[in-house]
């Protein structure tokens, strides 16, 4: 399984608008449902840097672009960002209920 991590800084003065847009977008995702997607948008405390984690189940087409609000959000995002995003692929080594990993029951000895 692979998880994409995006770090993006937001311009001064755009933070509140960006946060509101993210909340609206995630409310839309909750309303319509995204099958096979795990997605979180977080902000580093006391900073204007967002960290986004995105996981797409194997064999699934990314459903975000089929929701009209998502491309509109991406277009608006262009006016808020400060610099290019840092995009990295992560290999999940361990996870407890965060990503789509199955926990194996360990035997108590």
What spans do the regions from the language model cover?
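Short, surface-exposed ligand-recognition loops at beta-strand->loop->(often short) alpha-helix junctions
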Residues: 9-20
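An amphipathic, aromatic/His-enriched active-site/gating alpha helix that lines ligand/cofactor pockets
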Residues: 27-37, 54-89
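Intrinsically disordered, low-complexity acidic/polar segments
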Residues: 15-17, 61-63, 96
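Active-site-flanking beta-strand signature of metal-NTP-handling nucleotidyl enzymes
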Residues: 2-9, 51-53
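Glycine-rich beta-strand-turn "strand-cap" elements at beta-sheet edges
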Residues: 37-51, 74-109
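Short coil/turn motifs at secondary-structure junctions
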Residues: 11-13, 57-59, 94
């Amino acid at each position: 399984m692979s998880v994409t991590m995006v770090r993006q800084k937001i311009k001064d003065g755009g933070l509140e608008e960006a946060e509101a847009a993210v909340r609206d977008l995630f409310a839309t995702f909750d309303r319509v449902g995204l099958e096979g997607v795990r997605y979180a948008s977080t902000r580093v405390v006391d900073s204007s840097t967002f960290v986004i984690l995105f996981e797409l189940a194997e064999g699934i087409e990314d459903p975000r672009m089929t929701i009209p609000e998502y491309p509109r959000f991406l277009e608006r995002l262009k006016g808020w960002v400060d610099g290019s995003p840092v995009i990295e692929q992560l290999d999940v080594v361990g996870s407890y209920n965060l990503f789509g990993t199955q926990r194996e029951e360990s035997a108590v000895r």
